[in-house]
Amino acid sequence: MKNFKNTKKESFLSTIPTASIELDTDRLTVKCKFNFSYFCNSQSAGQDFKDWDNDELVKLFEKLKNYSEKSLNDWKTEFTGRYPVFVIYDNFPRKSDFELPKNLPHQVKWARFHLENKVRLVGFVIPDNFHDKVHQKTRERFDKNTFYIVFLDKEHRFYITE
């Protein structure tokens, strides 16, 4: 039996670059990540996913996809109109219709993404001094580029300014 080669095919395939996380051009390590493990849908000031209509959910996931293209640090310098896209508040706000969930680590820094108009995505990040630190039990590293989503805030009730 003869072994046939398709040299045109092999030549063409060799021109297609191979993606790799080891390439200098790869930006996987700087793209922010979203985590829903602390999501709280039990407070009346916030909403659950089922409370948002299809268009609102589509907008939310389009924003998450867009925000995933950069680091959290990059988003602190971006604006949507006159509002920063991403803000870290450090502490839970004094004036809020939300209550501080009891299951969150006390070290967290509260933050939010501005989605549109009054709509905010509220959560937290870990402090810079925990970044790359190894957790004593899991042996995994903390990552300051992860946004932990806690609340959906459709009416800007997390950080009351008026």
Predicted feature descriptions by range:
Residues 118-127:
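Catalytic nucleophile-His microenvironment captured as a short glycine-rich beta-strand/loop
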Residues 1-115, 128-162:
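Basic, Lys/Arg-enriched alpha-helical interface segments
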